[in-house]
Amino acid sequence: MSKKYIIALDQGTTSSRAIVFDHSTNMVASCQREFSQMYPKPGWVEHDAMEIWASQSSTLIEALARADIHSEDVAAIGITNQRETTVIWDKATGKPVYNAIVWQCRRSKAICDELKTQGLEDYVKQATGLLLDPYFSGTKIKWILDNVDGVRERAEKGELLFGTIDTWLVWKLTEGQAHVTDPTNASRTMLFNIHTQEWDETLLKALNIPRSILPEVKPSSAVYGHTRIVGEGSHIAIAGMAGDQQAALFGQLCIEEGMAKNTYGTGCFLLMNTGTEAVQSQHGLLTTIAIGANGEVNYALEGSVFMGGATVQWLRDELGLIRDAQDTEYFASKVEDTHGVYLIPAFVGLGAPYWDPDARGALVGLTRGANRNHIIRAALEAIAYQSRDLLDAMAKDSRVELKQIKVDGGAVANDFLMQFQSDITNVEVQRPDLTETTAMGAAFLAGLAVGFWDSTDELKLKAGVERSFTPQITAQKRDSLYQGWQNAVARTR
């Protein structure tokens, strides 16, 4: 095999990374660069799309240098990205007309409220699988068209293009040759009908968005074009892409119906593959596309918790109870239980399955005997309880009782948390050998598209489990603890 490597570009909310993998899925080299966060008004979040491009393109070049390899050694590049973040740029010059509006940005809430008054809430959920919320790209696009001078007119003349970050990067990498996205990213725009696999004319009309600015939707594993970024004569295929959470699902090889993964980052993202059926949630979850490849689309249920690792950051930065996130395992293990204490980290409201923006955080059950260790333990347990909330909602929606969940993200190194997660959900928790599952998913998609790997069966042989955690408490104890959590949550709403 002359081409021995795959490169994954992992474009996240705070940094851009490039990772070089070999055929055995070993990480050969990596490079990471942070970029600026802009908060022009309360609730507004922006990125400079050109800075994202500069950070991502430079990490690609540096990762190649660190691996001491040349472009001709690389079989393909795969891309995974922060989802929903919105860029509109000039087709001729390649310059954005405005900063990228980030997924966290809430500025388009009034547009969402207007759509609700038009009676479109149920239609949005049925067609796109999403909630009518500023989180998604559609209302961000409308905001730029309506509020930046001259942009709507230029868009209607066909002079401008829209893309989520995957689309923007592919367009730049291919020097404007490819204006494409994949089904996972398209499904997060609130403009894509996940059943017909087409941009939805009803929603485009409701938001007054010209169809001409939207990218072509291609499979998640396919060759979209080639890049010469690493020098004249280079010609690397851009061959796979997926939004970050779907890439992690694929990287964990959750490719069959009923398989699920939980990513523990700042928040928690639990996704469950529901196969070829788009399950409409009745319990506060999103219906989204898991992957679109080989002429088939798989769907997923998705639940997100706002405060996962961020709860531990709060213990460290605001309360000063710990110096390092890793210390939580030591302190939590020094006590038998939380002494009846529950921490509900509803600092910015509650996410799925509650979707209560007005809920606020609370420490419930404090007595004179409660100490620092109990509170630290309660913070870790809160992450697991919230994941149990999501798992229960998924079981009700999918009518599938999960027996196993795969985990990734920074917090999975915490053995106490992983064991308690297994205990409170009564599910086996599997921690993989390789925790870079998001980048790995992008690499897998690209490698499969160009024949670097033959099949997902081959990939399964390379995927190892570093440790499995199995339930160690009684059903009675589990039910009692979870009832206490539910009672505590009720007091925050």
UniProtKB/Swiss-Prot annotation:
GO terms for biological process: glycerol catabolic process; glycerol metabolic process; glycerol-3-phosphate metabolic process. The keyword Transferase applies. Inhibited by fructose 1,6-bisphosphate (FBP). Its EC number is 2.7.1.30. ATP binds at T13, T14, S15, T266, G309, Q313, G410. ADP binds at T13, R17, T266, G309, G410, N414. Glycerol binds at R83, E84, Y135, D244, Q245. It holds the Pfam family FGGY_C. It is an enzyme of class 2 (transferase). InterPro entries: ATPase_NBD, Carb_kinase_FGGY, Carb_kinase_FGGY_CS, FGGY_C, FGGY_N, Glycerol_kin. It catalyses: glycerol + ATP = sn-glycerol 3-phosphate + ADP + H(+). Pathway: Polyol metabolism; glycerol degradation via glycerol kinase pathway; sn-glycerol 3-phosphate from glycerol: step 1/1. Gene3D superfamilies: 3.30.420.40. It comes from the Bacteria. Keywords: ATP-binding, Glycerol metabolism, Kinase, Nucleotide-binding, Transferase. One of its GO terms (molecular function) is ATP binding. CDD domains: FGGY_EcGK_like. Sn-glycerol 3-phosphate binds at T13, R83, E84, Y135, D244. Signal peptide: none annotated. One of its GO terms (cellular component) is cytosol. Key enzyme in the regulation of glycerol uptake and metabolism. Catalyzes the phosphorylation of glycerol to yield sn-glycerol 3-phosphate. Belongs to the FGGY kinase family. HAMAP family: Glycerol_kin. This is Glycerol kinase. It comes from Shewanella halifaxensis (strain HAW-EB4).
